[in-house]
């Protein structure tokens, strides 16, 4: 993937034209047991900023990790530009809208959960208003004994999502009103179709939420209402007998 290569060049290159500030940290994890549950993990985080431009890179070297797939190289990358009212992000994004009822993205390696988004994000913010737009792809890895190749440490199937979402938030003196829309086009794996073969089911999920928060001197109140619809996305059909089946 060429994107990470250009990200590294960008991080190094901005140091040639101005003052570059960098920080970093390293996490080392190692374990052994008599039942052969062994793991070795190394995580390296690099952060750089130059004026209004920020970048984050994470490298992982695991052989094997405690949970998840083996990785040796660049794992995450994000480049941001933060203006006075706007923010543009490209790369691996993690967002929380409201209290996380409709969108709550995190990377928790302790349980091998990563539901972040690889794509772009745009934010416009003033004192009274904030709007966010996100778009990109999301791969969620899971394990199940209903699919071939089950392993309690390594995921054996993947759910692919193509996401698009909008979040609007209006601030008032002692309250705020927000609206969120999130659409996911998912390729959901199923163990067996009508021909007893592994297959993928195309689904479209649409979520909408309306939330209100009130902050008073003696109490705080937060209410959110969410609706969700899911339907199958038929890309083509084949006539078969007296009916038809998805192709």
Annotate each predicted stretch with a short phrase.
Residues 1-5:
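Positively charged n-region of N-terminal signal peptides that target proteins for export
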Residues 19-40, 48-72, 82-85, 103, ...:
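Signature for the C-terminal beta-barrel architecture of outer-membrane proteins
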Residues 76:
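Phosphate/ribose-recognition catalytic cores of enzymes acting on nucleotide-derived substrates
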Residues 94-105:
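Surface-exposed extracellular loop regions of Gram-negative outer-membrane beta-barrel proteins
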């Amino acid at each position: 993937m060429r994107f990470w290569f250009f990200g590294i060049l960008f991080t190094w290159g901005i140091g040639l034209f101005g003052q570059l500030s960098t920080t970093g940290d390293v996490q080392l994890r190692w374990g052994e047991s008599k039942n052969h549950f062994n793991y070795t993990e190394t995580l390296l985080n690099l952060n750089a900023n130059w004026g209004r431009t920020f970048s984050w890179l994470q490298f992982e070297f695991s052989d094997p990790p405690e949970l998840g797939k083996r990785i040796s190289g660049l794992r995450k990358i994000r480049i941001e530009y933060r203006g006075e009212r706007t923010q543009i992000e490209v790369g691996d994004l993690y967002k929380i809208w409201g209290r996380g009822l409709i969108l709550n993205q995190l990377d928790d390696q302790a349980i091998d959960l990563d539901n972040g988004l690889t794509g772009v994000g745009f934010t416009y913010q003033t004192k009274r208003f904030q709007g966010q737009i996100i778009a990109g792809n999301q791969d969620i890895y899971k394990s199940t004994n209903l699919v071939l190749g089950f392993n309690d440490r390594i995921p054996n199937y993947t759910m692919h999502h193509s996401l698009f979402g909008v979040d609007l938030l209006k601030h008032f003196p002692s309250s705020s009103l927000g609206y969120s829309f999130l659409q996911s086009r998912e390729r959901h794996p199923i163990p067996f179709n009508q021909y007893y073969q592994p297959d993928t089911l195309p689904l479209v999920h649409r979520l909408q939420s309306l939330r209100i928060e009130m902050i008073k001197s003696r109490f705080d109140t937060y209410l959110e209402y969410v609706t969700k619809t899911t339907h199958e996305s038929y890309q083509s059909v084949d006539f078969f007998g007296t009916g038809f089946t998805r192709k």
